[in-house]
């Protein structure tokens, strides 16, 4: 099975910047909203495909959008993939379906997002890691949690519970455990409590911990 990893943090905290130490052949980036990286790089960024159509309902458009993402993840040749920023999948669907009445749409939104995570978990590729870069917000206890679109969705889905590895990014650092400040969590002994916001280091450490194939270029392997 592939491994989904969640990275949460406020805008500008260093989530996307953490990709800087990857080489272009090592990482694929699916951009939901932005089209460029915050540093100079030859890493390929794929903008999410537009499915706007007068003949399709907003619900159908969003199903097509998620299906396209799943297809890209499955076909991508890199061992590591990033979805940046994944919370816009929820936010954009909310705006797309703003004219729909009733609560069923919130259940649909939660199901679409959950199914994407489950797709990664069930993908028959033991060496693939998919990173969900996601904005955070404060919960009722004052901790940073996954930003969703309100209590209606939170009641349907605990996003953090779908991941074994959740990192909290703040001030260009990753925090790996819930210390009262966030909902971060990682397996015992995988990381120190505080590490640099270097997703390449995270990727290498996770692969070593779980015995996954290394994600290195041919030049690196020959050294």
Model segments located where?
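Short, well-ordered coil/turn elements that cap or connect secondary structure elements
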Residues: 24, 40, 125, 160-161
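Short, well-ordered beta-strand core segments
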Residues: 27-29, 130, 166-168
């Amino acid at each position: 099975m592939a491994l989904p990893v969640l990275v949460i943090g406020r805008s500008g905290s260093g989530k996307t910047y953490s990709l800087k130490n990857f080489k272009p052949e090592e990482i694929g980036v699916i951009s939901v909203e932005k089209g460029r990286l915050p540093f100079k790089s030859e890493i390929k960024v794929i903008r999410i495909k537009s499915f706007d159509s007068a003949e399709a309902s907003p619900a159908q458009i969003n199903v097509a959008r998620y299906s396209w993402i799943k297809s890209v993840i499955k076909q991508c040749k890199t061992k590591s993939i990033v979805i940046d920023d994944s919370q816009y999948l929820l936010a954009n669907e909310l705006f797309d379906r703003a004219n729909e009445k009733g609560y069923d749409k919130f259940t649909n939104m939660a199901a679409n997002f959950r199914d994407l995570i489950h797709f990664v978990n069930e993908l028959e590729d033991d060496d693939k890691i998919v990173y969900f870069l996601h904005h955070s917000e404060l919960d009722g206890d004052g901790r940073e949690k996954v930003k969703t679109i309100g209590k209606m969705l939170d009641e349907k889905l605990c996003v953090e519970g779908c991941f074994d590895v959740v990192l909290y990014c703040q001030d260009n650092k990753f925090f790996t455990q819930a210390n009262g400040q966030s909902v971060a969590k990682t397996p015992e002994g995988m990381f120190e409590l505080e590490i640099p916001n270097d997703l390449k280091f995270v990727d290498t450490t996770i692969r070593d911990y779980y015995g996954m194939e290394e994600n290195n270029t041919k030049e690196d392997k020959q050294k």
